[in-house]
Amino acid sequence: MKFKYIVAVSFLIASAYARSEENDEQSLSQRDVLEEESLREIRGIGTKILGGLKTAVKGALKELASTYVNGKRTAEDHEVMKRLEAVMRDLDSLDYPEEASERETRGFNQEEIANLFTKKEKRILGPVIKTIGGVIGGLLKNLG
């Protein structure tokens, strides 16, 4: 009789353990899905902000470039125009960063993708912002 109880209790413990393992796997997969959706939302927001900023900067740079085109240029003005053109090319290369990032990072896990995307943004945006700051500073110095 005791043997039957031992077998029954063992069976109940084993089935409870199997159910808990199954629930753990489901909760982990749900958590992974939520993390992936969060990363996509963050990237989408970042891309929209970057796109708006890029559009504003491109408009300002085109306005500054047209101002320089209409007047006489010195060697310094010519250098500023070259910088503006380089910045415009850099901004144009940012048109589809997410697609390029997806192509380059196929097979990586989500954390590596997020780190690579952030590093790529820093690598591109750092020099662009520095150049824009220098150009605008030079323009203000020349105009003032």
Swiss-Prot record:
Location in the cell: Secreted
Keywords: Amidation, Amphibian defense peptide, Antibiotic, Antimicrobial, Cleavage on pair of basic residues, Cytolysis, Fungicide, Hemolysis, Secreted, Signal
GO cellular component: extracellular region
Gene Ontology biological process: defense response to bacterium; defense response to fungus; killing of cells of another organism
Modified residues annotated as Leucine amide in this record: L143
Sections of the chain in a coiled coil: none
Pfam family, one: Bombinin
Keyword RNA-binding among record annotations: no
Source superkingdom: Eukaryota
Residue positions, PTM Asparagine amide: N70
The keyword Secreted is annotated on this UniProt entry: yes
Expression sites by tissue: Expressed by the skin glands.
Residue span(s) of the pro-peptide: 19-43, 74-123
Signal peptide: 1-18
Function statement: Maximin-8 shows antimicrobial activity against bacteria and against the fungus C.albicans. It has little hemolytic activity. Maximin-H7 shows antimicrobial activity against bacteria and against the fungus C.albicans. Shows strong hemolytic activity.
Family in the record: Belongs to the bombinin family.
Name the UniProt record assigns to this protein: Maximins 8/H7
Record organism: Bombina maxima (Giant fire-bellied toad)
